[in-house]
């Protein structure tokens, strides 16, 4: 990639229909794990006008009121009024869970290559990434896109901008100079609002746009990056119909929002609703943990990790490191350090990151990475000093 370029990432709020689905799926996972942390869970959710459908495969000893979990999640997000197209009290919730296939379970319970370990729950490839663009070691565009919609929800819930409704999307276009963030070229923020805020694009009140820029955007984005920045606020002019009424929501349909905003490849597997025997989730978390510790150790300014698995096999097919020329030692040497200091077998990942806990609801909105939450063990940099010493730095 050229040293001077524009790069864009987007995020969506907790009220976006796909994120509603993700949050319900992870709330169900947490409710199950609170009783039985060895459950096998693949909880999928569909949301539409006045309707929630829960489906997937669950094998558990837990006794969970799935319908109530779904309603509680919708309430917490803020869909508490029939005018919003879905409300927690009156929406229909359909439940259609099966048990995990025994064909899959036998390969997960005992790995074909390591009888003392668990096998991967599926084949697949996963990526982790870290870079020095922000203190959280995340790419700046996705990091700030998350913070914008997070602030939208905060101001909606605390009543400072009472005309806001739950659905919102943000997009940040960053200008890079010499390969580093220089300024923000464009900010797009579309937020659902009450009907009285605008009737047509030409009648949109200036006070609405001003409130979004002054109360949401400017408090979040670094002022030194706001140089001739273009602001596009509700570009269609009206955003009253939103959430599951505006679009059908599905679990796992915001995988780029959930990860790095397109700054690195994605293996295609979603996270929400999946227990950590599913390497789509746990190995992606582990790959982030590895990449973040490599950058924190000063071994590279940016680091991409790829791991891949075969179903029923414990050991990854490959561990590949790519630092895009920023590494202080060869990528192959960093990969050897990773293999020596991180157990990337499924059971090893679960133990290393303490994943058999009801910690997943927090991950389901505003990004799985780059957030200093105590539950997010994959954000620790506790291996940085060890890696640095092992590299001889």
From Swiss-Prot:
Entry's EC annotation: 2.5.1.6
Cofactor(s) required, per the database record: Mg(2+); K(+)
Binding site for L-methionine: 57, 100, 247, 278
Class of this enzyme: transferase
Top-level taxonomic group: Bacteria
Record's keyword annotation contains Aminoacyl-tRNA synthetase: no
Reactions listed under catalytic activity: L-methionine + ATP + H2O = S-adenosyl-L-methionine + phosphate + diphosphate
Keyword match Hydrolase: no
Positions annotated to bind K(+): 44
A Gene Ontology biological process term: one-carbon metabolic process
Chain residue ranges for the region called Flexible loop: 100-110
InterPro entries registered for this protein in UniProt: ADOMET_SYNTHASE_CS (IPR022631), S-AdoMet_synt_C (IPR022630), S-AdoMet_synt_central (IPR022629), S-AdoMet_synt_N (IPR022628), S-AdoMet_synthetase (IPR002133), S-AdoMet_synthetase_sfam (IPR022636)
Amino-acid positions noted as binding Mg(2+) in the UniProt annotation, renumbered to this chain: 18
SUPFAM superfamilies: S-adenosylmethionine synthetase (SSF55973)
Location of the protein in the cell: Cytoplasm
Pathway annotation from the record: Amino-acid biosynthesis; S-adenosyl-L-methionine biosynthesis; S-adenosyl-L-methionine from L-methionine: step 1/1
Single GO cellular component term: cytoplasm
Subunit organization: Homotetramer; dimer of dimers.
Known function: Catalyzes the formation of S-adenosylmethionine (AdoMet) from methionine and ATP. The overall synthetic reaction is composed of two sequential steps, AdoMet formation and the subsequent tripolyphosphate hydrolysis which occurs prior to release of AdoMet from the enzyme.
Official protein name in the record: S-adenosylmethionine synthase
Species for this entry: Delftia acidovorans (strain DSM 14801 / SPH-1)
Lineage: Bacteria, Pseudomonadati, Pseudomonadota, Betaproteobacteria, Burkholderiales
Gene: metK
């Amino acid at each position: 990639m050229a040293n001077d370029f524009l790069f864009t990432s987007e995020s969506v709020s907790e009220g976006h229909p796909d994120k509603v689905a993700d949050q319900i799926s992870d709330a169900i996972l947490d409710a199950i794990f609170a009783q039985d942390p060895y459950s096998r869970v693949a909880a999928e959710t569909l949301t539409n006008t006045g309707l929630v459908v829960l489906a997937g495969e669950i094998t558990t000893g837990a006794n969970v009121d799935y319908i109530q979990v779904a309603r509680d999640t919708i309430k917490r997000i803020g869909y508490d009024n029939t005018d919003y197209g879905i409300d927690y009290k009156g929406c229909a919730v359909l439940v259609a869970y099966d048990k995990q296939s025994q064909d899959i379970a036998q390969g997960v319970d005992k790995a074909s290559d390591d009888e003392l370990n668990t096998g991967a729950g599926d084949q697949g490839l996963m990526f982790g990434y870290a870079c020095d663009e922000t203190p959280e070691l995340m790419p700046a565009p996705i990091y700030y896109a998350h913070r914008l919609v997070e602030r939208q929800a905060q101001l909606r819930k605390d009543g400072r901008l009472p005309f806001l409704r739950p659905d919102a999307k943000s997009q940040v276009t960053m200008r890079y100079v010499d390969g580093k963030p220089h300024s923000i070229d464009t900010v797009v923020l579309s937020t659902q609002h009450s009907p009285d805020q605008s009737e047509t694009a030409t009648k949109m009140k200036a006070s609405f746009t001003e409130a979004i820029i002054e109360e949401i955007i400017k408090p979040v984005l670094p002022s030194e990056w706001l140089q001739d920045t273009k602001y596009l606020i509700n570009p269609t002019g009206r955003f009253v119909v939103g959430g599951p009424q505006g679009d059908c929501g599905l679990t796992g349909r915001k995988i780029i929002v959930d990860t790095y905003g397109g700054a690195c490849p994605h293996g295609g597997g979603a996270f929400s609703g999946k227990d950590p025997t599913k390497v789509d989730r746990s190995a992606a978390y582990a790959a982030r943990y590895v990449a973040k510790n490599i950058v924190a150790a000063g071994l590279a300014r940016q680091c991409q990790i790829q791991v891949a698995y075969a179903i029923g096999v414990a050991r990854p097919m490959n561990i590949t490191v790519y630092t895009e020329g920023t590494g202080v030692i060869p990528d192959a040497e960093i990969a050897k350090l990773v293999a020596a200091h991180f157990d990337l077998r499924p059971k090893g990942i679960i133990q290393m990151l303490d994943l058999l806990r009801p910690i997943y609801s927090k991950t389901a909105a505003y990004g799985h990475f780059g957030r200093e939450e105590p539950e997010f063990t994959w954000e620790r940099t506790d291996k940085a000093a060890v890696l640095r010493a092992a590299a001889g730095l």
